[in-house]
């Protein structure tokens, strides 16, 4: 009986553990060859001339290697995307047009955006939901950072099995989103969870979350990413769907 009591008193943490029914790998119906990644991000300077059009890339040579868009493209490819469709936007008002153009491209399974804030993330969500309802199955991937409570609030505002919010402690949200998006697109077997996956490419070093913070993030629909011994890895990969109606939803 004492052994049973000890087992009952164990704390169940989300690092790692039993995966929820809304694992992001289970939403994207990818084939054995993977999916293409579509990226929308602000561009300026030398890349401004490419704004407002879809650029198809199989290697990271279309945009400046120092720009956010250039780095996002490189990271998506480095993590397994076989093809990237990139659409540079000049201002916040151009994102809707970017999503419409990108989601009309061939074999897109992941839409990555550097959008931020509640309204920006919800715009991505609405775009991928509309595409999926039109039989163009895809998920959106965006980055979030800041206090754990702020990341949770954004996930709850999005609350969709079609959206993955990549939470870190470091700046460069779009970069982390692109890396995770590439890894998701590369999955040939949708039953394989992405938790614990190492991310390739030049990513900013980010901090480590406590077990309690991981619990709070994952249970609220945030995919936690952190650095350990110089390696950036996905702790748990979930979609932002955490509530159904007014109650929690982990099915």
Which ranges hold each PLM region?
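A glycine- and small-residue-enriched flexible loop/hinge signal that marks low-structured segments
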Residues: 8-15, 19-30, 34-51, 55-58, ...
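Acidic, aromatic-enriched beta-alpha/helix-loop junctions
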Residues: 58, 62-65
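Short, Lys/Arg-enriched N-terminal segments with co-localized hydrophobic residues
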Residues: 1-6
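A broadly used, surface-exposed interaction patch
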Residues: 66-104
């Amino acid at each position: 009986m004492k052994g049973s009591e000890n087992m009952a008193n164990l704390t169940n943490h989300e690092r790692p553990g039993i995966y929820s029914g809304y694992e992001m790998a289970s939403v994207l119906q990818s084939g054995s060859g993977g999916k293409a990644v579509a990226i929308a991000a602000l561009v300026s300077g030398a890349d401004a001339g490419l704004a407002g059009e879809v650029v198809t890339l199989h290697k990271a040579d279309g945009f400046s290697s120092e720009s956010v868009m250039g780095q996002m493209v490189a990271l998506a490819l480095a993590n397994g995307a076989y093809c990237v469709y990139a659409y540079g936007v000049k201002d916040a008002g151009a994102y809707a047009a970017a999503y419409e153009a990108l989601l009309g491209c061939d074999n897109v399974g992941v839409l990555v955006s550097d959008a931020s804030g509640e309204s920006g993330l919800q715009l991505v969500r609405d775009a991928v939901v509309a595409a999926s309802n039109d039989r163009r199955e895809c998920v959106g991937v965006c980055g979030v950072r800041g206090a754990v409570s702020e990341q949770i609030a954004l996930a709850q505002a999005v609350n969709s099995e079609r959206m993955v919010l990549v939470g870190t402690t470091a700046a460069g949200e779009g970069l982390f989103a692109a890396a995770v998006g590439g890894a998701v697109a590369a999955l040939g077997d949708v039953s394989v969870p992405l938790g614990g996956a190492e991310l390739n490419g030049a990513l900013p070093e980010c901090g480590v979350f406590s077990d309690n913070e991981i619990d709070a993030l994952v249970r609220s629909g945030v995919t936690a990413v952190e650095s350990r011994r110089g390696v950036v890895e996905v702790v748990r990969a979930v979609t932002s769907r955490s509530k159904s109606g007014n109650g929690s939803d982990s099915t």
